[in-house]
Amino acid sequence: MSTGRSTGATAGSAAGTRRPARPPAEPVKSLPCARPSTDWNEVVASRRPAVEGYTSIDSAVPGTDVGLYISATAARYRIQAYRMGYYGHAQACLVWTSAWQAGRVQQRVKVVGATNTPTAPWSKSMTMATKGWDPGVYLLRIDGGSRTARTFMPLVMRSPSFAGRTVLVMPDTTWQAYNSWGGYSLYDGPRHSFKNRSRAVPFDRPYDARTGAADLIPYELPFVALAEKIGIPLGYASDVDLQRFPTAFLRAHAIISVGHDEYYSPTMRETLTTARDHGVNLAFFGGNDVYRKIRFANTANGADRLEINYKDATDPIKTPSLVTTQWRETPSNNPESSLTGADYRCASSVYYPMVVADPTNWLFTGTGVQAGTKLPGVVGQEFDGINIARPVPRPLTVLFHSPVICTHRPTSQDSTYYTTPSGAGVLDIGAYYWNCAIARRCPAKIDGATSDIVTRITTNFLTAAAAGPLGKRHPAVDNVRTYYPRPRVGN
């Protein structure tokens, strides 16, 4: 493992690489929209919102009637549905506005059973028709009449077919795992107690991320907008769709895990593995992906609306295929790296630069980078790395190899790309802040040169992956031994 200091220059610095070449200056058509919106995000975050709600289903094909469950201390409210993406200077299109409804306060939270499951056992407030809507990622804004009385509900309008498309998958199982509405998440309970955490969290409750939008705005929306701007054929799905419709993904050209995508059921993981083995390209544009193992159960609102994860041996289900310890742990013993390429390395509160390892790789075309070029601030929070003591698909190319200090130990972040006999190419960016770097809206300051490079690499991958199996045109060249001549000790 290389832990030495890189001598490469920072992206765009005078002492090193030139600023990356920009994409061709061709006019890019924005998606048609009668009512593009630049004020969709005029929402004041609140720990006690005047309006909040959730949908009866997290993902549905256009034409589905969607139940809305709303609680409001505001005297009245309305729903405004925004399709999110690329609309020129706007990232939202207003597609529907409800009539004003009388506000009604519903029960705050009901915590159920030994699993500490926090539910919102609310009556349905209204039904929203979606006939004629386009597939895509939506935010439903609950408007209580002022900027301080607004929150969101995320919704995916699933594509009726994924054939020939690059499918953007929203990480709603991870959104839900971290959602602490009602005082419980899969991480903690009251007073931030890990011991009293929930072991089963339902989709039948609002998201508590201050605005109700989970992580969609900072970590998924920049990627969605860029993918739409590029103009490739896109499909849209949620994580739970990988569980419900596994065969629907087999005719896609690529499946993209957008953002932090940590929580996977056996069926979800098998859906991606089978698609890869049928020549479907995969990419993980986040870090810490496919790390936690979950299973689903039903709620009163439907199938697969309860997400179960114990994280330890207290799981009462002992069947190896269902027990919810980590994927790499007993009894699963199936590290995420066998699918993703790298695996979860560490969580850090310090921001580090990504360091270019192989600038000759096709993904760096047009970036102007050199070996050792640094992308400041992109490595942080959670990130991935290679451990050759675990299953690592080969041939595998290390694209970035970035020295990091985490939990007081030197280690490394790695971004990887491998190809398979089926022709599929699989990319693992392995960095939590990659997508927010596209829009320069990360916790760390992202400079323009770094954002340009991140955007160009993302564009290169999406454009090539949309054309079919990457391994036939861009086979991976193995360079793992350059950076890992011997197995690494520890996680």
Task: List PLM regions with ranges.
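Helical hinge/lid and interdomain linker segments adjacent to catalytic or ligand-binding clefts
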Residues: 107-119, 125-129, 133, 212-298, ...
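Ligand-binding face of N-terminal immunoglobulin V-set domains in extracellular IgSF glycoproteins
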Residues: 52-157
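Aromatic-Pro/Gly-enriched surface loop or interdomain linker
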Residues: 72-86, 92-99, 147-248, 469-472, ...
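Loop/turn elements at helix/coil->beta-strand transitions in domains of secreted/extracellular proteins
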Residues: 135-136, 161-167, 229-235, 250-254, ...
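Extracellular low-complexity, Gly/Ser/Thr-rich intrinsically disordered linkers
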Residues: 227-229, 242, 370-489
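Solvent-exposed loop/turn segments at secondary-structure junctions
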Residues: 162, 172-176, 241-244, 260-264, ...
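Proline/serine/threonine-rich low-complexity linkers at boundaries of modular beta-sandwich domains
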Residues: 23-50
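An acidic, glycine-rich "communication" segment
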Residues: 290-408
